[in-house]
Amino acid sequence: MPSRIVFSGKQQVHHEPMTLPAPAAGEVLSRALYTLMSIGTENIVFNRLFEDGSHFDNWVKYPFYPGYSSVAEVVAVGEGVTDFKPGDHVAHRGKHASHHLTQAMHLVPVPAGMAPQKAAWWALAKIAFVGARAAEYLLGDTVLVIGAGPIGQMSLRWAVAAGAAHVVVVDPMANRLEFAKRGGATRTFSCPLNELKEPLMAELGGELPRVVIDSTGHNAVFAEALGLARPRGRLVLIGDTGTPTQQHLTSAVITQGLTIIGAHDCHNDNGWNDVKVGKYFCRMVQSGRFNMDDMITHTFAPADCAKAYATVNAARGTAMGVVFDWSKSE
């Protein structure tokens, strides 16, 4: 029977049955293979780590159905659907659920031979892609990525793919930096941000980076990040904090002439929507230019969802790619 994961309240998660109708015209019914947990966002939501009046507060209403990055197998198609057929693998913005009904126009075809565990990353890669577009990378660029969680991992890979000469990654959790090295980081640091400036400049020949990516979603990082960009540099905020009133400007904005850009998942532009970016991500992974090897650290059965979220809360340093395996669901 189809099933899904639901948050019924703060730190309350359950696996419950559900029903779905047959696909209508233009729709596709798919059976999930894997859904990837967005461990940063879902940690904020699960633990209600956000302030009243924030966009998280406006978004999270119970029952809340988490998840937004699914890879699935097509089961049936509705009238008029010609681009997909039963047996095809697709990626889409599916919740943590065994089955989904999706408009065909919103599905990303997954190439034959692409591991579904890699394809499950597509939505997080798309979020980081928005940040890469906002960064306006140049060939030979110098980039600092703050935070080596899932969004930071995707961010550094886009910077590498865009031709940056130096992609430096900092995170206090050393285990995460091993994933960054495999993704193409040219140097990693695990020191606090207030101790980073001197070694960072030494790494970059006496200069600070032109682009700083804050992927953390931690309110205290913003002020520190402002001091790590070169004069007239760019700070791109991808990490989505639940406490935006605690993010503060510093004098570096004026004295250094910095450009600050917020980059959010919803910022589609010039045709770069979910499907187009998803297809591009798949091509990049398949070509070897976007290394996604060994990114899954934890796999859970949907019925073990309480254990999954407890594990992610307790193992922030070792959890990276956390997936629910729906492949055995009926």
Please report, for each region that a protein language model flagged, where it lies by residue.
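N-terminal glycine-rich cofactor-binding segment
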Residues: 7-22, 39-71, 91-93
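A glycine-/small-residue-rich N-terminal strand-loop-strand element
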Residues: 69-93
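Mid-domain Rossmann-like dinucleotide-binding core that forms the NAD(H)/NADP(H) cofactor-binding site
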Residues: 115-193
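Glycine-rich cofactor phosphate-binding loops and adjacent beta1-alpha1 units
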Residues: 178, 183-261
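C-terminal substrate-binding/catalytic core of Rossmann-like NAD(P)-dependent dehydrogenases/reductases
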Residues: 198-202, 206, 247-296, 307
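C-terminal hydrophobic helical "lid"/dimerization subdomain
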Residues: 223, 231, 277-330
